[in-house]
C-alpha cells in the first residue's frame, strides 16, 4: 500500500496524467480514469489497484486506436484485429475494444460485405470479390448470403462491357484472333468471372470459340 503524492498533467498530452506514489513516478494513465477510479492526491493505493488502472488504460488506448482506424476506412473484424495486434495490444484488450465497436455498430462484417460487393461489382466478378472477402476474414455464412443476392444478369452485363472495352484495345495490337481470344479470356478470368461467362463473351466478341 502506498500514498499518492502527486498527479501531474503531461506536458505533451493534456489528456494523460502521471501518477506518483510515495514521491516516485509509478504509472501514467488517461485523465478520465482519475475521475472514474476516484484517484486523488493523498489517497492510498495498492499494487492490485494500480494493475487494474493500467489494464483499463490499455483498453482506452486500444479502443481509441480502433476508433481512429475505422474512422479512416471501414474494416472487417479480422482487419481491425490484425491492425491492433501489430500495434502491440494484448488479445484480451483487443477483444474488449472489438466488442465495444460492435456494440455501437462501428464494426459489422455483414454491412462491410454488402458495401464491398456493391462497390466492386462495377468492375469485378463474384469470384474475385469472394476471395478478397475471404482474405479479409468475412465468414462463409455471410459470404454465401451476400453473394447469393448478386444479380447474374447485371454481373454478365458488366463483364461484357469490360470485355468490350478491353477487346477494342487489344484488337489494335493483336492481329491473331486466337491469341486475342486468349488474352481477352484471361482478362475476364482475372476480373473474377466464371468460365462459362468468359467463354460466352469472348465468342460473342470475336466470333471464335475460345480454346485453352
From Swiss-Prot:
<dbReference type="InterPro" id="IPR003783">
    <property type="entry name" value="Regulatory_RecX"/>
</dbReference>
<comment type="function">
    <text>Modulates RecA activity.</text>
</comment>
<keyword id="KW-0963">Cytoplasm</keyword>
<dbReference type="InterPro" id="IPR053924">
    <property type="entry name" value="RecX_HTH_2nd"/>
</dbReference>
<dbReference type="Pfam" id="PF02631">
    <property type="entry name" value="RecX_HTH2"/>
</dbReference>
<comment type="similarity">
    <text>Belongs to the RecX family.</text>
</comment>
<dbReference type="GO" id="GO:0006282">
    <property type="term" value="P:regulation of DNA repair"/>
</dbReference>
<dbReference type="Pfam" id="PF21981">
    <property type="entry name" value="RecX_HTH3"/>
</dbReference>
<dbReference type="Pfam" id="PF21982">
    <property type="entry name" value="RecX_HTH1"/>
</dbReference>
<protein>
    <recommendedName>
        <fullName>Regulatory protein RecX</fullName>
    </recommendedName>
</protein>
<dbReference type="InterPro" id="IPR053926">
    <property type="entry name" value="RecX_HTH_1st"/>
</dbReference>
<dbReference type="GO" id="GO:0005737">
    <property type="term" value="C:cytoplasm"/>
</dbReference>
<dbReference type="InterPro" id="IPR036388">
    <property type="entry name" value="WH-like_DNA-bd_sf"/>
</dbReference>
<dbReference type="InterPro" id="IPR053925">
    <property type="entry name" value="RecX_HTH_3rd"/>
</dbReference>
Amino acid at each position: 500500500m502506498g500514498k499518492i503524492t502527486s498527479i501531474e498533467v503531461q506536458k505533451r498530452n493534456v489528456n494523460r496524467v502521471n501518477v506518483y506514489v510515495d514521491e516516485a513516478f509509478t504509472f501514467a494513465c488517461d485523465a478520465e480514469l482519475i475521475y472514474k477510479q476516484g484517484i486523488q492526491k493523498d489517497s492510498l493505493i495498492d499494487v492490485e489497484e494500480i494493475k487494474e488502472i493500467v489494464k483499463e488504460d490499455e483498453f482506452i488506448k486500444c479502443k481509441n486506436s480502433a476508433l481512429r482506424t475505422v474512422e479512416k476506412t471501414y474494416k472487417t473484424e479480422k482487419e481491425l484485429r490484425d491492425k491492433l495486434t501489430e500495434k502491440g495490444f494484448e488479445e484480451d484488450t483487443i477483444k474488449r475494444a472489438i466488442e465495444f465497436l460492435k456494440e455501437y455498430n462501428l464494426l459489422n462484417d455483414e454491412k462491410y460485405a454488402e458495401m464491398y460487393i456493391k462497390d466492386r461489382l462495377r468492375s469485378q466478378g463474384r469470384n474475385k470479390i469472394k476471395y478478397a472477402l475471404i482474405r479479409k476474414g468475412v465468414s462463409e455464412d455471410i459470404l454465401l448470403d451476400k453473394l447469393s443476392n448478386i444479380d447474374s444478369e447485371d454481373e454478365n452485363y458488366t463483364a461484357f462491357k469490360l470485355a468490350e472495352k478491353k477487346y477494342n484495345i487489344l484488337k489494335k495490337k493483336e492481329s491473331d484472333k486466337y491469341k486475342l481470344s486468349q488474352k481477352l479470356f484471361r482478362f475476364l478470368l482475372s476480373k473474377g468471372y466464371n468460365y462459362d461467362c468468359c467463354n460466352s463473351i469472348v465468342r460473342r466478341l470475336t466470333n471464335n470459340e475460345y480454346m485453352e
